[in-house]
Amino acid sequence: MVWFFEYYDGCGLAIKVKKKLYEAEGVQKVEIYETESMGKMLVIDGKIQLTELDEPFYHEMLVHVPMLSHENPRKVAVIGGGDGGALREVLKHNVERAVLVDIDRNVIDLSRKFLKIDHGAFEDERVEIAIMDGKEFLRDCEIFDVIIVDSTDPVGVSDTLFDREFFELARQKCDVISLQSQSPLIQKEYFRTLLVNSAPFERRDVYLSCVPTYPLALWSFIIGGEYDFSNLEERFERIKGKTVHYNPDVHRAAFALPEWLKKEVEACI
């Protein structure tokens, strides 16, 4: 048995692993592990992206909050998310078309082979896969009801998904957007930058989820655009029985921010 360590901003996380299943170098360094207590684990460029144990706490909140805040989402784009978790959640809704845009085919191929958390989403006839930069995709793409940004940390190949131009393009291409916005506890500069750069979505809010394998477990998301939280119970009937974590009570509670975080958000929006 060996331990996998991830270090960030003066602290870290250790996870006992049984074995490394695969490692590949390309656009990014992709590693997949079998862990002692958290199932399979995906690591990109040294950063934990998911474990089987807690990935629903992330993917369900990233996807169902915007999807159930839209009256009738039919066309959805997932930017990033090559592991297939977000795509899996999107397809629980009655969508007509879902486009997955990821710059790194390795992530998709290795996730399909080793992780298999997509539960067949990659083979769904409603799905189209585009291997390209997310910002470049937005320049010429069609209009979507919802865009979901499931990116890695805002460095390296993902940094173009966090600048002001990205959000200016996205605002022209969707009704509602959601994105992960890092740890508001120890990644404050990233968090603040995302709040500021997402200003093309004049209406936007922050919400939270607990994701134990992410830095300090408290993880933030931003939703922007023309979202509507009424009729959550009625809309939840679309996916009732299909979620592990998400429900309307969790949805509403996620927007109850502690006072220190309210001040952070108000200072940036």
Curated annotation (Swiss-Prot):
Q: Which UniProt keywords apply?
A: Cytoplasm, Polyamine biosynthesis, Spermidine biosynthesis, Transferase
Q: Does the keyword Transferase apply?
A: yes
Which of the seven top EC classes does this enzyme belong to? transferase
Residue numbers annotated as active site? 150
- Positions of S-methyl-5'-thioadenosine binding: 28, 102, 133-134
Q: In which pathway does it act?
A: Amine and polyamine biosynthesis; spermidine biosynthesis; spermidine from putrescine: step 1/1
What's this protein's name?
Polyamine aminopropyltransferase
Encoded by which gene? speE
